[in-house]
């Protein structure tokens, strides 16, 4: 069995997640914890299978992948870092935005 990679979250992604969670709790009372639940699920997937997300072609940084969270309609943008090997979540971006996140 493969070991889970540690996951770091950038300051930008932390702020985006907080904003999304605040909005979601106010506007989606039937599923107030959906953002957190979907992020936990995504983290579980990418920590074991870093290549699970599609290559992010809508940003200028190379090596970035994105995983779609269909239930909440957000993308998690992340990349694999080495030495030590780990995942960094770079952005949390709603699918309705016309362009990619500011990376």
Predicted features along the sequence, with ranges:
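Enriched for short, Lys/Arg-rich terminal
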Residues: 69-103
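Basic, Lys/Arg-enriched alpha-helical interface segments
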Residues: 1-64, 82-84, 100-102
């Amino acid at each position: 069995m493969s070991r889970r990679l540690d996951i770091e979250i950038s300051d930008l992604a932390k702020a985006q997640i907080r904003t999304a969670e605040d909005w979601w709790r106010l506007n989606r009372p039937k599923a107030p914890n959906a953002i957190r639940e979907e992020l936990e699920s995504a983290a579980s997937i990418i920590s074991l299978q870093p290549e699970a997300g599609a290559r992010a072609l809508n940003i200028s940084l190379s090596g970035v992948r994105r995983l779609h969270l269909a239930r909440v309609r957000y993308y998690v943008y992340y990349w694999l870092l080495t030495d030590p090997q780990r995942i960094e979540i770079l952005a949390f971006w709603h699918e309705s935005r016309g362009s990619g996140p500011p990376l």
